[in-house]
Swiss-Prot record:
HAMAP family: Formyl_trans (MF_00182)
Gene Ontology CC: cytosol
Catalytic activity: L-methionyl-tRNA(fMet) + (6R)-10-formyltetrahydrofolate = N-formyl-L-methionyl-tRNA(fMet) + (6S)-5,6,7,8-tetrahydrofolate + H(+)
Family the UniProt entry places it in: Belongs to the Fmt family.
Binding site for (6S)-5,6,7,8-tetrahydrofolate: 112-115
Molecular function in Gene Ontology: methionyl-tRNA formyltransferase activity
Keywords: Protein biosynthesis, Transferase
Name of the protein this chain belongs to: Methionyl-tRNA formyltransferase
Organism: Shewanella oneidensis (strain ATCC 700550 / JCM 31522 / CIP 106686 / LMG 19005 / NCIMB 14063 / MR-1)
Entry-linked InterPro entries: Fmt, Formyl_trans_C, Formyl_trans_C_sf, Formyl_transf_N, Formyl_transf_N_sf, Formyl_transferase-like_C_sf, GART_AS, Met-tRNA-FMT_C
Role of this protein: Attaches a formyl group to the free amino group of methionyl-tRNA(fMet). The formyl group appears to play a dual role in the initiator identity of N-formylmethionyl-tRNA by promoting its recognition by IF2 and preventing the misappropriation of this tRNA by the elongation apparatus.
Gene3D superfamilies in UniProt: Formyl transferase, C-terminal domain, Formyl transferase, N-terminal domain
Amino acid sequence: MKPLNIIFAGTPDFAARHLQALINSHHNVIAVYTQPDRPAGRGKKLTASPVKELALSHSIPVYQPGSLRKEPAQQELASLNADIMVVVAYGLILPKVVLDTPRLGCINVHGSILPRWRGAAPIQRALWAGDKETGVTIMQMDVGLDTGDMLLKTYLPIEDDDTSASLYEKLALQGPDALLQALEGLANGTLAAEKQDETLANYAEKLSKEEARLDWTKSATQLWQEVRAFNPWPVSYFEHQGNTIKVWQTQVSTTSSTAAPGTIINASKKGIDVSTGDGVLTLLSMQLPGKKPLSVADILNARGEWFTPNTRLNNEAQ
């Protein structure tokens, strides 16, 4: 297969994994587009994206326009004469003139099985909803939000111990192989595009810190799903004794309770059992303010008086 001249557009580490795969392939990455450097860390020092750092380490030209809606930026991109543009978590809207510029258009690596979970947080929303599988879709981009024709899909079962962090890692391994396979099919003309079924589409909204507050009136199963979805960000939490306590790991208990939602049923080094709107949730790992995440056994050693049976959590809001 003849090598393709590729423009790569992406920003975070997930995108950098895909760029590395392209660099390692026989294709030519002729330019990289990434978000402008942003202030980061305590010193708010301007910091390059992982994609920019990787590109510069391989002497690949880097472009960082604040927008691709203006003609000078569009002309600059067109002058590169790329065969195709590969977009992975770039973070900028591509107008139609940009989508139509490369000979083979623009393709996107998306972290869900489209048309389910279009949008910004597909990995997290799959966990949040209790989905049994996720995957990667390689899509021909159009002007809609993740609405383009699907070129290739891979599938990944979601395990009970998966979190957003672990799924992110698994999809970051699966995605690059799918991308290379799709590029080969496009170059050879052997890929058959599949339209998305709009009746199956839904939207993966961004997560918010407010959403991560545990609502004990929900079912234990839903709360377990949320804790996994919000790990490592924004991390589920509840308020107690005037403090915000983060929850990193839970499991659904086999015990039952008629106590009011948010009531501690039992507290031992194996876990803290909390009554919910349906079932009992066992807290396994938590984080006190200013501290590192700890097992419940260590939490009880430090603050056992906070978590005695019959105590109500989030009681300030009830």
